[in-house]
């Protein structure tokens, strides 16, 4: 079940959580109450769902979930990597009855996902980032795709397209996963021509369309 405009979501999830969300929390918090109806999955994005990139890829996955029987999906866009994500997670649990949360941005995990996982042991949290360790709560998992393999193929294509032998890569932040993607891209390009070079620019933000352009 997709929510309305982002502005309305911000009001309902963050501003009103301390008030109206208190009503009926005990019923929504019980595992039995969730099991009686459809499974509700909450998906949280750090930027807009139509960014033609990371967030949109997750949004397409959420759209596929909506087609599954017995599954409802609630979503919120433009949630910063601050305490805002904790408020959004809590409202999805307490207001929407979510039993599975998919916070998709790297900076959500520590401390925000870990805090909410400990506070809500019956709710499963699956974070995109590959940051899980055995010390984390049992209901807090982390996953990550083999994106570098796709970037390797992108590098091959770029190598065949370039005439200058100079490539560019616009990235967000120099975290290990991003650096792995950059390396995959350059290795793919150099499998075609070892003399190719790549200039990398970091924007410093996960979703900053103007600077990315």
Map each language-model feature to its residues.
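Short beta-strand elements at the ligand-binding edges of bilobed clamshell
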Residues: 134-159, 169-174
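C-terminal segment of N-terminal export signals and the immediately downstream linker at the start
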Residues: 30-43
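Extracellular/periplasmic Venus flytrap/periplasmic-binding protein
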Residues: 177-213
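Periplasmic-binding protein-like
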Residues: 97-106, 124-128
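N-terminal secretory signal peptides
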Residues: 1-11, 15-30
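Structural motif
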Residues: 73-92, 204-213
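Flexible loop/hinge segments that line or gate small-molecule binding clefts
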Residues: 118-144
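Extracytoplasmic "Venus flytrap"
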Residues: 40-61, 65-68, 74-85, 106, ...
